[in-house]
């Protein structure tokens, strides 16, 4: 779990793992959703997290001048991701979708908003605690990306309400 005291490379690795955990959760939720709209929404959210993972990987590799490209690719496939964004255990999220059937897009969006808001709060806290300037910049960028996700999710909720 991130603390804000990591060096830049470690912060990127930890952030990557959390993004991967969230991506995997959204993919599982898509498979278990009770409606095609919820499946589509979770599938789209999973792709958002893939974009975050690619961003983090590109930063990591640019710092190392692409020296570890093959190693990072292997790491990304093998790395277990027990935590989702915000440090939420993936198993807790999985229990949430087991406890009730996600029957519509609104349910899917509400779960996603909770995850993204928790993630935003974590990255904000980490940016405030970061000892390395470079790590602070990364945490602030991740926080901004989570803000964008929350804005997009809220816009999607408004569109559903209009239907």
What are these regions (language model features)?
Residues 1-163:
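Non-heme di-metal
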